[in-house]
């Protein structure tokens, strides 16, 4: 914080292939993760690995160009560490994006799902970023998660999408996080769909848990970059290149959506 005069109130986390959101910021100041003491490093293609400060529609923002995942070998607490850094900077609202596989049979590639709730599958086995001694300076020992995704922000996202004529590909649903890096099997996809998940991915949830623990409001959106395979006769296979290509095609509209949203906060 000694190297920037910016005091952001909005934090933005860019998902795979969506790092262009950071380019929307004015008066940008960029710091590589490698130059930040004790900060993890991005190792995934499509994640630039830098923290960008600036303003967006009059709001002071900090943007993560690249996030961290369990499959990179980081402890879950390290994956979500940036959320506590955000809190200490003064961030009040976090907007998170990710790339996800569609489980809902009504979804299409290129749809954007506003996350209304999540299933923390690794959490069933104790993989939760709040495990260990509670950091009382951030929040309580047992934080509720029934309001993890701010309902007013979700409503605002729908309103803004309608104003920008983007409603035709907007959805709202439940996101399930898995550990990765292997994509899900057919049986796993069928199970997750029956559990009530509309989309599946490998990020976001751990960040949201820590952000909510610290009292920040959260809005999260998934870009549906592939449809999960749930048919044993299908020859389709998920791949990361497909994820990045879909993100590239939808990037401009997502940037407009997020930029307008930030201006309304």
Predicted regions and their residues:
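Metabolite-binding pocket within alpha/beta catalytic cores that recognizes anionic/polar moieties
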Residues: 1-145
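Structural motif
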Residues: 8-12, 59-63, 92-95, 111-113, ...
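Short, flexible loop segments at the rims of nucleotide/cofactor-binding pockets, characterized by
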Residues: 70-75, 176-179, 196-197
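Glycine-rich tight-turn/loop motif centered on a GG-T
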Residues: 138-146, 194-197, 232-247
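Active-site rim beta-loop-alpha module in soluble metabolic enzymes
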Residues: 144-193
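His/Asp/Glu-rich mid-to-C-terminal helical/loop segments that flank catalytic regions of hydrolases
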Residues: 229-265
């Amino acid at each position: 914080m000694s190297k920037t005069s910016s005091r952001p109130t909005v934090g933005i986390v860019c998902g795979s292939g969506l790092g262009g959101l950071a380019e929307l910021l004015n008066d940008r100041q960029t710091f590589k993760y490698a130059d930040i003491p004790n900060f993890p490093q991005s190792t995934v293609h499509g994640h630039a690995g830098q923290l960008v400060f600036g303003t967006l529609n009059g709001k002071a923002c900090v943007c993560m160009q690249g996030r961290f995942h369990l499959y990179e070998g980081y402890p879950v607490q390290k994956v979500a560490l940036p959320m506590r850094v955000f809190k200490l900077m003064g961030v009040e609202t976090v907007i998170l994006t990710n790339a996800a596989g569609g489980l809902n049979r009504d979804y299409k590639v290129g749809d954007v799902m506003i996350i209304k709730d999540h299933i923390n599958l690794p959490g069933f086995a104790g993989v939760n970023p709040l495990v260990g001694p509670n950091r009382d300076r951030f929040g309580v020992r047992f934080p509720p998660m029934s309001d993890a995704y701010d309902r007013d922000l979700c409503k605002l996202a729908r309103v803004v999408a309608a104003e920008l004529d983007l409603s035709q590909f907007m959805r709202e649903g439940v996101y399930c996080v898995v550990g990765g890096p292997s994509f899900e099997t057919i049986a796993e996809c069928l199970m997750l769909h029956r559990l009530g998940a509309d989309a599946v991915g490998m990020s976001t949830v751990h960040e949201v848990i820590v952000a909510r623990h610290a009292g920040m409001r959260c809005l999260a959106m998934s870009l549906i970059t592939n449809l999960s395979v749930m048919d044993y006769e299908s020859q389709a296979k998920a791949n990361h290149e497909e994820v990045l290509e879909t993100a590239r095609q939808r990037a401009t509209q997502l940037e407009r959506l997020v930029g307008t949203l930030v201006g309304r906060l």
